[in-house]
C-alpha cells in the first residue's frame, strides 16, 4: 500500500470509532489498511420461509467509497429487515444503477434446498454470487458464521448486515430480488398469499396450506406442522 493511502486509512479508522456512518465501514477499513482493496460483502435472504428459493447477493464497493466518499444517496443502507419495503426498493434501484458497484445476485431453488438442506443451499447461493463477481474479490466479509465451503479468505461478522455497509447492501439486493420473485409466484400459485408473506409461515399461509395442500414451490423438507421447528415461522432471514 502506498504511504499516502496508509495514512488516509489510519485517519479514517480513528474517525470511525467516533462516527456512526464510518463505523459501519470499520471492517472494510481494517482490510484496506492491510492492503486489500476488493472486499465483498455477502448475505442471503429467504432461509426461514416455507416456500420459494433462497437468494444471496455479493457486493464490492470501490475502495474510494470506503475511504470516505460514500454517496449520500446510499447512507440509509442497513440490514434489509430494518428497512421499510419502500426504502429497500429505492436503495436497490440506486445500488444496481451505480456503475461503480460490482454486484451479483443468485438463487437456489426449493428442490435443491430439500436435497441438501437450507444451510448448504444458503452457502451455495453465496458461493455462486461470489463466483460471478468480476473482478473477483480478494476478501469476503460474511453475515453470521464462517462459510466452510467458501474459496476466498473471509471474515464472519455476527449481525454483519447492520454492522457493515457492504453486507447491508448485499442483504438489500438479496431480499428485494426474492420479494419481487415471490410477488410474481403469487400469480402462478394463487391462493397462498405469497405476495403478502413472501413464503413465511404466517397464520394465513399455514391456513392456505391446510386448505390447498402444498404447491411446487413449497419446501417439502420444512414441515409447517412440526412444533419442534418454531424458527421456521419467523422472518429471521
Each language-model region and where it sits:
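RNase H-like, Mg2+-dependent phosphodiesterase core
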Residues: 1-237
